[in-house]
Curated annotation (Swiss-Prot):
Family according to the record: Belongs to the methyltransferase superfamily. METTL18 family.
Chief place of localization: cytoplasm
Composition bias type Low complexity, residue spans: 84-109
Taxonomic classification: Eukaryota, Amoebozoa, Evosea, Eumycetozoa, Dictyostelia
Species the sequence originates in: Dictyostelium discoideum (Social amoeba)
GO biological process per UniProt: peptidyl-lysine monomethylation; regulation of translation
Segments of skewed composition (Basic and acidic residues): 25-37
Name of the protein in question: Histidine protein methyltransferase 1 homolog
GO cellular component, one term: cytosol
Domain of life: Eukaryota
Enzyme nomenclature, EC number: 2.1.1.85
Positions that bind S-adenosyl-L-methionine: 132-136, 159, 179-181, 209-211, 229
Length: 309
């Protein structure tokens, strides 16, 4: 698979003294079960610009309606765009390099298009961003039904994929940063979905890459609301997700996480994530909604906040 890029993040820039002190304390705890980052490749993180000519590409695109609470609706692409953003960015490449780049792009496109029909996750390569996961709708329903104030809020959607929860926030006045593991998901799915729903592109940013490097890239940036759904299937990634939430949630902010209570067969789920939060003792977690609709295993929406010292 050709989904690894040589972008580097200066780790020295992430020099929050409090975080270093907390990390030193946490290093004394046995949380190896929740942190397998050393055992797999991790995609570096970077900000993603808006795709070239995106508006014109959307003129003949096929969309479908996703319905949530009280018959409210959002749009999404029926299928992600095909092709690679790099194909649109070769104007400043000399002819010899162009031949090499075209060969690389062809290989990238073949690998990318194999993933469009992929239903399984490939750790370190593809994290399921092209699929619309049911818990993302659970989050939208919760935000709508509980009338969560979104106007002017800074929002981070972790593992966004289609980006519908973030788009809902964007349409309700938030400033949203969308994050997904694969930049191909951002270019070919998230950004198009933002535009077809009429989202303000000037109030949206996009980041790709592994959570470890996203944490570093964001430096000391804080968010009023953090959203994430169906991201608890891999216990070995829990510590990175925990760090991302803990380091970037405003002191009085709230994280809404939607997940299955248990992911049978893989060991993940909300109960397991609660174990890590209890060990590290920096965040509080409470269930704010149970979903037992018979469509899948029991699902929950939980609210995560900073503990009051």
């Amino acid at each position: 698979m050709s989904f690894k890029f040589n972008f580097q993040v200066d780790e020295d820039e992430n020099d929050n003294g409090n975080n270093n002190e907390q990390n030193n304390e946490e290093s004394k705890l046995d949380i190896s079960e929740f942190d397998s980052s050393s055992k797999m490749d991790e995609l570096p993180s970077k900000y993603i610009d808006l795709r070239n000519n995106l508006s014109s590409l959307l003129s003949n695109v096929e969309t479908e309606i996703v319905t949530f609470s009280s018959n409210n609706k959002l749009k999404k692409l029926v299928k992600p765009f095909k092709g690679n953003q790099d194909n649109n960015n070769d104007n400043n490449v000399n002819s010899n390099d162009k031949n090499d780049n075209n060969n690389n792009n062809n290989n990238n496109n073949k690998d990318y298009e194999k993933l469009l029909d992929k239903t399984d996750l490939i750790p370190g390569v593809y994290e399921g961003g092209f699929k619309l996961w049911e818990c993302s709708i659970d989050i939208i329903n919760y935000l709508f039904e509980e009338k969560i104030d979104l106007s002017g809020k800074k929002v981070l959607e972790i593992g966004c994929g289609h980006g519908l929860p973030g788009i809902y926030c964007l349409l309700n006045g938030s400033i949203v940063t969308f994050q997904d593991y694969n930049e191909e998901v951002i270019y070919n799915l998230t950004q198009p979905n933002v535009l077809i729903n009429g989202g303000d592109i000037n109030r949206a940013k996009y980041i790709s890459g592994d959570w470890k490097f996203v944490d570093q890239l964001l430096k000391n940036e804080k968010f009023d609301i953090i959203l994430t759904s169906d991201t608890l299937y891999n216990v070995g990634s829990f510590k990175k997700l925990y760090n991302l939430i803990s380091n970037h949630l405003e002191s009085n902010g709230k994280c809404y996480l939607a997940s299955k209570t248990y992911y049978f067969g893989v060991g993940g789920g909300i109960r397991k994530f609660e174990e890590l939060l209890k060990i590290l003792n920096r965040l509080s977690i409470k269930t704010v909604r149970d979903i037992k609709d018979g469509l899948s295993n029991v699902r929950e929406v939980v609210e995560i906040t900073n503990k009051i010292n």
